[in-house]
Amino acid sequence: MKFDKVVGTGGVGTGMLLLSPIQDTLGRSESRLVHMSPARDYCKLHIVFHYIAALIGKQTEVYPLSYVGQDTMGEELLGEMRLAGMHTEYMGRSEELRTMLSVCLQYPDKEGCNMTVINSAASRVTPEYIRSSMEALSVDANTLVAAIPEVSAESRIALLREGMERGAFCVLSVPAAEAETFLEADAFTLCDLLAVNEEEARAVLSAMDKEREGDTQESFGDELVLRLYEQVERLNPEIQLLVTFGKHGAYTMAGRRLEYLPAAQVSVKNTTGAGDAFLGGTITGLCLGLPLQKSSRESALEETELLSAAELGTLCAGLAVQCEDSIAWETEPGILDGIGISCTDIKTGRNKDTLQ
């Protein structure tokens, strides 16, 4: 099924990228001199939706629901979003609070962590604002809605609930620190696709399977994905799953079938926006009518046509890590080759039917 409208909420803001000169993880009480990168960093909703708008914004309406401050930063961000092809009519402006700020600390191996300011304009995103915006946008079965981090959990859950009631396809991304909150709110029953990274997958699994919490930390790759799927499927038998593992690739689960996607083999400059780019590309593929997985069809080794939404996600993540900024600005519709979507960088991964 194709979708002609994408509506989502999450953080919109900018930030700074700090580069650690040593690989050791920053200690709780440690002070460390770091380098400030000239790279531009952005908050999650902006990153995810940039790929959707840049690739298919001319045929699919893309509506971010969030807030920025009545400041220069907010005005610049809205301009960038419009330039990418997003509709910003439902972006609020706060006179009291500044635009969201995020700080990323990156280690020499290009991995890192993010800290995002809570008391920013994005805190103005409320469940009431979400519901009224979705009503005005006439969200329906032809709409994909996405709940992205960096606004309140209550607002994201309201978006999922409203989207589900209106027949939309619902996508959820859950930060590790909020796994318990979303489980208690039955949010996993309100989504069609759960998209998480390795750390987030462990957190959700630990919240669901406390008796085996110790084993969760030892699980990796397909074992972790299968255990997580077995837990969320009990709550939502139709749920699909996307789990990214950075340079180790990603896995999808759909219809009790596991599929592996290797990471694009490219030169890496910055990984901070890769996971969000993967999700943005995957959502784009779903809007185009691609299935999450290649299903039962096996590609020839030399085949370049993309057969799944997750493969388009891999392509976008590959573009992202080659860019110093957390958004790959060169993303454009030319990447999509007519009806057949092609990419020479992505090879066939291993597929297997796993749950009988």
Regions found by a protein language model. Give the residues of each.
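Conserved phosphate-binding/catalytic region of the ribokinase-like
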Residues: 1-10, 179-180, 207-356
